Regions:
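A short, Lys/Arg-rich alpha-helix, primarily the initiator
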Residues: 1-13
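DNA major-groove recognition helix of helix-turn-helix/homeodomain DNA-binding modules
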Residues: 42-60
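Short alpha-helical DNA-recognition segment
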Residues: 14-38
Length: 60
């Protein structure tokens, strides 16, 4: 899965980066870490197969 595909799925569901971060379990200091989702979408962090599968399940 590419960052562009993640962004397309997220926007199709009408979700914010923070909402996706919360569903995927990305937290920092008890708050959803939307910056990790932004890093995925911008290509600054690779989406591994485990996370890609989780994204597909959560955003289905």
């Amino acid at each position: 899965m590419t960052g562009a595909e993640l962004k397309e799925l997220r926007l199709a569901k009408g979700m914010s980066q923070g909402q996706v971060a919360e569903l995927l379990g990305y937290f920092s200091n008890g708050k959803p870490n939307r910056s990790m989702i932004a890093r995925f979408e911008n290509g600054h962090a690779k989406i591994n197969i485990r996370i890609a599968n989780l994204i597909r399940i959560v955003l289905k």
